[in-house]
Amino acid sequence: MNFFIIDKKEDLLGIVLTHAHEDHIGAVAHIWPYLKCKIYATPFTAALILEKFKEKKIEISSYLEVVALNSKIKLGNFEIDFVTLTHSILEPHGLSIKTPLGTVLHTGDWKIDPNPLIGSQIDEQKLKSIGNNGVSAMICDSTNIFSPGRAGSESEVRDSLLRIMEIKTNRILVTSLSLIHI
């Protein structure tokens, strides 16, 4: 295993997860045995993490910290505030990380969806407050960020799929990375 973090594990305070999509949690069960640190996740993400560790027959319940939605945790000199966002999975959160040198905003994956199919709406007021208080750096990931205009709502995708399924009489095959659209 050749991950730079293994060489720095004595400095690692924990793993904080923003949401439960496979590209964000998939490697955790593989690298964790080398780190043996706390894992912080909201209830839904924590449930999926537990399943991944069960598949590998690794007991981590004493290392897994379930974080309430919109709450704060403290890791060393870092105060981490979970910020509700919208995405195509339950409980997506950004992280406002207060450090001795300033605030870092890490969005995880997100989009501004005024009509999310699941979960709460994005906490725009909290994001504005964080911005008004000053952000030293922002780590942001959002699909199609460079596409002009507004992104459609997940509810629009669902409605389109339902219309197509109503008019087709033969078999319909649907594949998806996130199945909340249906």
Give residue spans per PLM region.
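His/Asp/Glu-rich metal-coordinating catalytic cores
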Residues: M1-G14, H21-I180
